[in-house]
Amino acid sequence: MAPPFLGRKTSYENDGQLAPEARLQSANTPGLKMVNLSSTPACELDRFIKDHLPADTSFHAELRADIDFICAFLKERCFQGAAHPVRVSRVVMGEHTMLKGRSEANLVVFLNDLPSFEDQLNLQGEFIEEIRKRLCQLQQEKTLQVKLEVQSSEQPSSKSLSFKLSSPQLQQEVEFDVQPAYDVLFALRNNHKPDPQIYTKTYAYLISVCTTLKKEGEFSTCFMELRQNFLKHREPKLKSLIRLVKHWYQLCKEKLGKPLPPQYALELLTVYAWESGSRDCEFNTAQGFRTVLELVTKYQWLRIYWTLYYDFRNKKVSDYLHKQLKKTRPVILDPADPTRNVAGSNPLCWRLLAKEAASWLQCPCFRTCDMSLVHSWEVLTKVEFPQECVLL
């Protein structure tokens, strides 16, 4: 039996017909003060976000430290004596706008010595089981500042793995979806100004594999670092608006109790709304929030993409992008992975969310002090492609 990992010595101690009731409360966080978002005046939304949405700073600091610890632990312990000579190269947490109470995040375990996307696909089950085993060891050793709970799998051969880090005292928890990934960007990590052609070749290779295997979007986790960078350096107030939209999304999820579009699609929609309609560092939050909800109601026209990491200059990539953008809408391409439409493929999900968004547009949170409705930003809903940056 391996000795306890000694990377760090700490221990875990113990509105009438308006929008429906929208309260900041969760079954997992019963002590949170109940606050009605729908009846919060537009002029007080910034205060609402500041007081009620960001994760507790103490928990956030402990969480970051524990993620670093888990990364070091997995790098030391994983795949010792395994049949496949892979090693953990790094662990990346994909979350920059965490909410108070309960949040969800991806934890991508990048593997070096893994030669291809196909190997990731074929060996995913083995990798998941190895990581699960090591996390269970860490859970028993209790060396983290917050509480670690590895979720049990319903199926022995499951290719999914999740664990929870929580602080009962702070009433805060984050559930992580763990995904092993081929480190396709390994050569670019330490290069501050990589040759754009390297990205082009990487995406051409990705497109070739995904179309051949009919696995579009399957390898998006391999580009998690680029997805992180897309949001990491955004304006603080834009991140606050993303938190507000995520909170609204969670309220809709609790009320409707049915599958909704992926949350990440709403985050990207928020970025698009700001880039297209404002770009002001000190924008009006109610206007931004209203713009996002109006875009949700127009989901059948959404066609959005960015050309930050991939573009139309390479013929193979260009041909593929044109095919993607001509598909049934909504289309919201992952800025880090052109094969992944983050809008999903279920129009019923969008129809449900659009109906809920429409019911919110008359709420007090969109009214000024004289009770007039705030105006949304002017955002184009139909632009021909290709263009330099973003299309709707």
Predicted feature residues:
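A structural motif
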Residues: 189-191, 198-226, 233-246
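Conserved beta-strand elements of beta-rich interaction domains across eukaryotes
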Residues: 94-95, 112-115, 168-170, 181-186, ...
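C-terminal helix/juxtamembrane-tail motif
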Residues: 345-392
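Short amphipathic alpha-helical segments embedded in low-complexity Lys/Glu-rich regions
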Residues: 85-95, 144-161, 260-267, 286-290, ...
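Conserved nucleotidyltransferase catalytic core and NTase-mimicking acidic/glycine-rich helix/loop elements
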Residues: 230, 236-355, 359
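N-terminal regions immediately upstream of nucleotidyltransferase
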Residues: 1-105, 109-129, 145-160
